[in-house]
């Protein structure tokens, strides 16, 4: 046996590997158990010094890895046949296996490529997929790229290239980096959301949503043609109101389309169409949006910083109304909550979804508007609806607050200030500019400043500063603040509209204010303010000198904690009382709540409101309809055209896809800080594309295309379906194929989805919510078999790394930082501060996987990332630690291959009882670890077994009965070296198609047992005894143990109690 086989285990960087050539061995070579002949094609070359010629190092690893990756690609090793269709070849071989569908959250193809943190989840899913294949499952594991969107377009603009060019290049680079990891994907199914053949079906799904409406009685989406049929038959009214069955539709939109409430037969063509459009799941509406003129587009809330600026470019963002495409996700709010019970997700992710949807039960209360005497504003008959979860506190309401963007504001505002209106109510408190200047001045001058009495008097005397001027100025001020800023606990700002409403409880008049702490996207965009019992209302009432009556009496403890005299009026309280106290007597003719519990008081008040026609029981959701328009180029074009009346029509299926036109200048029209002008999408500049002649059934006509594009979310809502059938040109997915992979045999109808979906927790809300919404629409319309897209969700952790900041607080490249002898860190000689953070380009602490491939090989990187900690936990990256994983693979290599000759070094020796027990115990444990996604402990068990082999057999050949199962168990984690060793052991088929070993519990049973020995109640040592040993045997072993003499020396042994197989108790005197 060559002395080179068991030499030192140093990594490549600890020696001069560049001075030696390394033989590799042929992939299909077979050696005799004696290892007398090197594999065919292997050439052992002279190393330097004692260095063996066949050491497993980075160069040998790279050769093995590339060779096996080519073979996998050539043989289609990881192709997963469908039951039917163009990808069905080979299905007969796997037809008896249970299908299992694994997905990764597909990446955005960044221009900077991958760092070692990106593949963490991809490696984990690959390990699991390989284990399942070896365990007899038919596994589908595809991959793709989420390539549309603002980041890709902005990167193209910054680099002066077309986004198609940069996106394709980025995908190619990412594909190269991932392929070096040896991920077992079915590459025939690779998709990118920017592929025309892909977004053709994204557009088709949008049309299904556009041509559907939500029937609240049926509790599902139905084709829009069925709604029209009901209108024509007279079984459903086209007028707004509860009787019309429009509870899942905006009543305001229906009322606007049919303001007089005429029956269907009396409506003209345009009005009929507008009524129908108001019911669609995809509709156009004026929405309050985050308008970023610097980027020329609308932004999602997640793309706006806390300071009210764009995350990309740091441009100012304004809140303003724009006509946008919107998807009616709110119709599915209840189902999106209820169906969380169908999925195997963590409780924390489910709660995040529930919180975002935000269901709450309460009451809808109507407040009748009472215009001031002599005012032309606030038309008679107007009502403001408020949603509240605390109708029991209505008696304490002293004012109403509307969001500045509330749709009723313009109709409410009075022409003149009511007599006696305080100056502080007339924003901007005594500093009113002329009406035309209001928007400009307000945002700069009105930051809730203290105003003197003289200024207030001057404001009251300024005839130009009318309620409408003040409201205009305040709305301009609020438009410059983000939702986050508006919700902060700061000095309250607001403006009086000049209008009042009547409180249904007690009949008192309540002034109506606008204030930015009320958001139009929550509830009805209007609140009844009960300042004694709500902190925000309390601070507003204090700021505007409004009454603060109490409805609930605090207990004695609250008074004591707040140092307030018991019974003191709320005006003397330091803050609102938000607890549950005793109800105080209310005005005559109002609900009697004294002595009731909170739930009973709420029920009593709701019944009282319903009886009087002032309100009703209601459920509200925090969830808002999904804003779906972007004024950018790099996105899916809408398959929509408009006629001369502005009515939208879906492009016929045969005209799909609507392709993005080529543009040389695709940049949006940037408008600096212009928050007034309407956006001009880039596609609107392509005149011959934006205007098109079509025959939509009534002869050729000229139509105008929709020139907005879809958001980046669109392509990721359904990619789990396209993976199943990516080459299908007739359907987005074949029905048989979809049911094979997603339906669960024997499960309830609609129960199914992707078996395992792995990705980061940052997508725990919106991506998952939007994908669930699209899935449910497709399910309702009969296009898919499962209600939920993802049956099981697993969130992997992040890889963190040291990051460094200089004296300016700016991050510097971590790779350029040096550590001094005294432990300090410097960058080009200047001291820097170290901190830990998520690896990424923003912290300049990325480590490229290309570097790790070159230094150690892909298998080493795979093993290290899985060994760092539990897959769902964050873990720190330390490049120096990866050498441990490399040494493990070196020991594995030496367990099979002689490093000196390159020949197989295994024997036909039978395993003794100990080796058998160790092997089967490892197999059983490892199978459980793989199945439970506990890959870090799987690595630990494999290291233990490999170390056992090294210690047990030393320079001797490893028994084949131990070497082969060891290689099989390593294969999911380190597939390249496993393939090489498996082939050298004489197997021609890929190790990926071999069966995972099966452990025998009987053979894994311990022949010895460790039992504790207690002395006077404390464990002092342990005793190894034969399994099943009787008391006399244990007593003999006990007295012979050296610790027994030490513990009992010079002491009287009162009693020795032996419980065989369990414990020994010694009582000393």
UniProtKB/Swiss-Prot annotation:
Motif ('KMSKS' region): 838-842
Organism classification: Bacteria, Bacillati, Actinomycetota, Actinomycetes, Frankiales
Gene: leuS
Top-level lineage group: Bacteria
Chemical reaction(s) catalysed: tRNA(Leu) + L-leucine + ATP = L-leucyl-tRNA(Leu) + AMP + diphosphate
Record's subcellular location: Cytoplasm
Ranges in coiled-coil conformation: none
Extent of the signal sequence: none
Motif, 'HIGH' region: chain positions: 107-118
Organism: Frankia alni (strain DSM 45986 / CECT 9034 / ACN14a)
Major subcellular site: cytoplasm
Compositional bias (Basic and acidic residues): 823-836
Gene3D superfamilies named among the record's database cross-references: HUPs (3.40.50.620), Isoleucyl-tRNA Synthetase, Domain 1 (1.10.730.10), Valyl/Leucyl/Isoleucyl-tRNA synthetase, editing domain (3.90.740.10)
Membership in a protein family: Belongs to the class-I aminoacyl-tRNA synthetase family.
Listed EC numbers: 6.1.1.4
Family matches, as InterPro entries: Leu-tRNA-ligase, Leu_tRNA-synth_edit, M/V/L/I-tRNA-synth_anticd-bd, Methionyl/Leucyl_tRNA_Synth, Rossmann-like_a/b/a_fold, tRNAsynth_Ia_anticodon-bd, Val/Leu/Ile-tRNA-synth_edit
CDD domains cross-referenced by the UniProt entry: Anticodon_Ia_Leu_BEm
UniProt keyword list: Aminoacyl-tRNA synthetase, ATP-binding, Cytoplasm, Ligase, Nucleotide-binding, Protein biosynthesis
GO biological process, one term: leucyl-tRNA aminoacylation
UniProt-annotated binding residues for ATP: 841
Keyword match Transcription regulation: no
Name listed for the protein in its UniProt record: Leucine--tRNA ligase
Pfam families reported in the protein's UniProt record: Anticodon_1, tRNA-synt_1_2, tRNA-synt_1g
Region (Disordered), start-end ranges: 19-53, 823-846
GO terms assigned for molecular function: aminoacyl-tRNA deacylase activity; ATP binding; leucine-tRNA ligase activity
